[in-house]
Swiss-Prot record:
Catalysed reaction, written as an equation: riboflavin + ATP = FMN + ADP + H(+); FMN + ATP + H(+) = FAD + diphosphate
Intrachain S-S bonds: none
One Pfam family hit: FAD_syn
Protein name: Putative bifunctional riboflavin kinase/FMN adenylyltransferase
Biological source species: Geobacillus thermodenitrificans (strain NG80-2)
Flavoprotein found in the keyword field: yes
Entry keyword set: ATP-binding, FAD, Flavoprotein, FMN, Kinase, Multifunctional enzyme, Nucleotide-binding, Nucleotidyltransferase, Transferase
Family note: Belongs to the RibF family.
Gene: ribF
EC number from the UniProt entry: 2.7.1.26, 2.7.7.2
Length: 179
């Protein structure tokens, strides 16, 4: 897997792009990423994970990161992605307008963009799936729930870890968490 900085101007002749913070690369994230790999193979193009580091919740709300950037990239490679684009999330990136993000994605020539149901982007989370669909074909991966019916999320996994429920957090992640 090739790793690129978001500001390097990567261009591809065609791709399927999965977008997200992917903190923890939990089972919900894995569903999004696997869908990107599967669709890219079906369409004969490269698969791309576009991620931000650190995750916004960690940067601005002080939440614990579940995975380092390297751990995240290692998981992407295991899942079979061809490329990872890493945007370094800071105040400047957070202030980006939605059109700047759309322009950046356009260079990847996405045949499809794959996101989770709650995907938002741009300054103040102004961009949504409807806006993304005006520019690209978008596929939304349904929320992944655990056996008790609750949504799998990085926030929920953090809460389990804080309570010392390591076994349950590992189940939701789908792989062992580094300490």
């Amino acid at each position: 897997m090739k790793v690129h900085e978001a500001n390097q101007g990567l261009t591809l002749p065609g791709s399927v792009v999965a977008i997200g913070a992917f903190d923890g690369v939990h089972q919900g994230h894995q569903a999004v990423l696997r869908q990107a790999v599967e669709r890219s193979r079906q369409l004969g193009v490269e698969s791309v994970a576009y991620t931000i580091d650190p995750p916004p919740r960690c940067r601005f709300q002080g939440s614990r990161m579940l995975t380092t950037l390297q751990e995240k990239l290692d998981r992407f490679a295991v899942l079979g992605l061809n490329h990872a684009v890493v945007a370094h999330f800071d105040e400047r990136y957070a202030a980006r307008r939605v059109d700047a993000f759309i322009r950046e994605l356009t260079a990847l020539n996405p045949r499809e963009v794959i996101v989770g149901q709650d995907f938002r982007f741009g300054r103040n989370r102004e961009g949504d799936v409807a806006l993304l669909r005006r520019h690209f074909p978008v596929r939304i991966v349904q929320t992944v729930c655990c056996a008790d019916g609750q949504r799998i999320s990085s926030t929920r996994i953090r809460e389990l870890i804080e309570r010392g429920e390591w076994e349950q957090s590992t189940v939701l992640l789908g792989w062992p968490l580094s300490s």
